[in-house]
Structures are given as C-alpha cells and as structure tokens.
Amino acid sequence: MAVPNNAAPTVPVIPSDGPHSKFVRYAHAVAKEHPPLFPITPATRPLVVGLDLRTLGPQPANYEDLVHVLRRDVVTPMLMVFADDDTGLAEAWMQVCEVEERFVIDYTDRARATRFMDAMQFGVSKMRGEERRCWRNCRTFDVYSEIDAHDAPTTDLAVDDRVRAAVLAAAGFGLGTDVIVSLGPTVGRADVGDNDIVTTVTPDDLHPVFGHYLRMTGNRTVAEYRSVGPGMSVVQKMEPPSVTEMYDIGLASLLGWLDMFRLVACQLRDVQAVAEIDTVRTRIRRAARALDEVVAALSRTNGRDAAPSLDTIEFASEAFDREMLYLIAIFDGYGRAFLRWLDPASGGDLRKSLHSAKTLDDYVDPNYPGAPQLTRLRELQRFAFACSQLRNRIHDAVLPTGSFTNRTYGSAQAIAIDLGQTEVELTQQLVDRLGVWRATPPNSIFGQPTTVAEVATTAVELFTASLEYIDLFTHLIMCTKPVNAPNAAELLGKVTDNGFRPPEPHPTEALYRQLFRWSH
C-alpha cells in the first residue's frame, strides 16, 4: 500500500551507542613495534644531487644554504668534474659533503669525443683519490643540441654550451642523479632538451626541489643545525608536529595578507569570518598537496623515454583534476564570504565567485574605485577563469590528458592537457605561462594538430597565480573601506596600510618560502 504524500514524516531513530552498521573489511593498524601495512611515509631513498663543480667553483663556503641541504642524511651528493678541470677542484667540497669520491667526466670538446654511430660517447669514472673504483660509458646525441639551437627563440646560447649540458645530463642520468646543481647558462631553460632528462637548477633553486622531496616522503624535518663542541656533536632539528602543519606554515609564509586577515577576524571575534577564512586556507593546503602529487607523478617520466606509462598519466591527471576542484572551491567560497561581508544583513544571493569577471565588475570595482590593486587583480582573474573552464570540463566529461611529443626530434613525449577539447579561452599571457604548444597526438599518423598545455607548467602556474590573486584581493579588502557598502562588516578596511614592510623576513619564514617556492 502506497504511503500518501501528505503523511507525517517519520522521525528517524539515531543510535547513541555507535553505528549499528559498519564497513569493516579492511586491515587495521598493528602494534607499534610492527610496520603499518600502508604507511603514510612510503619506502623512500635519498635525494641524489649532482654538483657541477666547474661552474660552482672550488669554494663551498660561498654556498652556505646549499651546503646545509647537502649535509642532510636524506641527501646523497655526487661531485661531478670534467677531465680537464683542476685536480683540486673537488677537495673542499669533499670535506664539507663528507664524501670520499668524485665523478670524472672524460669529455673536453666535441672534436675529441669518440662516436658510436650517430651518438657522441664518453666515460665517467668514480674516483677515490687516484684510484678508479668503477667506470661507465655514457652517450648523447649532440645533433639534438644543434636542432635545439636552430629552433630556439633566442640566440644567446652557444651550441658548445648546449652540448656540455647534454654531456652533463647524460652523465647524471647514468649515475642516477635526481637533480644537478649548476651555474651553467643552460640551467632551467625550456629550449634545452636535456633539461627533460635530468633537471638542472641553480643553488638557490635546489631548496624548492628539496622541499617537495620532504613533503612527498612525509619528512617533517625542515632544517637541521649542527654544532660541534669538545668531545660532542649536537644536532638541533626544526620539525613541525605534522606534514599538514608543515604545509600550513609554508603556505602562510607565501600568503602574508591572508594570514593577517585571519588574525584581524580573531581580534574582532567574528567567528563566522574566521571559519570562512579557515575554509579558504584548508582548500589552499589541499590544492597544494594535489599540485605536489602532480609533480611527484611526473618524476616518474624522463625525456629519454618514448612515452610515460598509463599509470603515470592517470596519477598525474587525477591529481591535476583535484587541484582544479580545490582552486575553484577557494574562489567560490571567498567570493561568497566577501559578498556577505559587504552586507551581512542582506540575506541575498551569495552565489558569486572570484573566478568571474562579473564579480569584479559588480562588487569589487564599485566599492574600491581607483584602487591600485585592480589592474593586477584583473590580470590574475584570467588565470582563475581558466581554472573554472577546466573545472567545467571535469564536471562534464573526463579532462583530456595524454602524452604528446614536445620536441621537433626524437620520440620522447610529455604529459599534457588537450585544450582543443575544452573551452579554455587563451590569452597570450596564458599561452606564455601555461606551457602551451601545438602538437599532433603520437598515435595519430594523419591526425590534425591540437593545442595542448604541459601539465606540470599549467598546474604550477595556475596555482601560483591563484595564490597571488587571493593574497592581493585580501590586501585590498582588509586595508580599504568599501565606499558603497554602508552596512559592511567591520572586518573590511579594518587595517591601515602605512606602507611599512620589514626589510628582511624572519629566517624561519625565509626558509619556508624557499621550501615552498613552486615557481620563480
């Protein structure tokens, strides 16, 4: 017998002694003396850092922060020199890094290099003093360096510099280095194909790589300070209670205005505003975690390989989707909170988002006319809008992500998003910053080129632009009274910015900024 629609609803009986049904078919934690089945911190190995001593020079004392990282027990330094370098180049580095070996690359110039078919080959010797402990043969296609030079948008790099970078990358790849620290002119350049094989960074840029390593391995020790006294050695550690709090501290170092805004809300005892700001901060942390997982997945790819594995593409794609969903949740939540703060008693429609230009047109521009932040906010809103268009595709269908060739030679492929199957509206600034190019799908012989965006670059640039957008918007509304909102919450415009800025950040803040610096 059917229940009539106008029947009184039955009040559910909710047990107070715990749930009466549970899913229990999963392994539980064992005693603490036994390892967990699925540990938060997976089995890991040290970060292997190659050092290009020809460009760094003989004095490690010039690189105090770099040495601090190299002396960590989770880092394995490899000292790399060329056969014609000064014999004493590595001596001081061996002492500070507490290693006994150096790796000698038997390469001087192209004319004297041996050949193996189309490849240039050279040896790398592991030396302890004058004793050779082992030797390996490495190869690189120097013609690729010539093609890179021909295709490059600028002519500021000599072919010999490109070939030397190729030799260094081939040696590093053979030795198992994760990253090479160098001051060579090819460091970090997209038009140098060998940066797809082994990442090269400046001494300062090793810190973000190391910070990502710490977060992905669950290592909470952000710094170690050693002191040696008579008969003893002391190591002091800077270690937050959890990886989650490490993210919170690191992101707060990048979002100073948002951090201050929360303090203002706490002082005003605006509980709802504090909760809204905390929600924004939590979503930023989760977006950052998703970004880190995108980069971690891409660490399984290499420019020597023909194509990334299907599992790697899936892992990176899922993490990128998650990042976009959290970024849009940030813009939506902050936009709605801002409208409520403009008129707390209105009770009107609050479904507005900071990703929308219309929100800036209708609510920001009229309340902050002539504000110096508006021009930059408009530029950053384009990045937020790109996030929303990618999010829309995620909701409608699967975001098309796959592998595409990203050089005019060879068969190596990069993971990229096929923007041709989305509605992302590209500006020249987005093209330049998101790593966009025209590519033909590798499995489509007669296919038409499509517009794609390199997933690592897109993930990093959208995230960093979003952080700047949120922090700049926070500065605007915290330090400026809205002119057309007579009933605005006290929170808006509560702080007077007199222009003072500390000349230098606190050392701890500076350290976290280095470890959480995803882009330059």
Stretches found by the model and what they are:
Residues 2-50, 54-68, 72-73, 85-278, ...:
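Acidic, Ser/Thr/Gly/Pro-rich intrinsically disordered interaction regions
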Residues 75-78:
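Small/aliphatic-rich secondary-structure junction motif
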Residues 269-323:
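A long, hydrophobic alpha-helical segment
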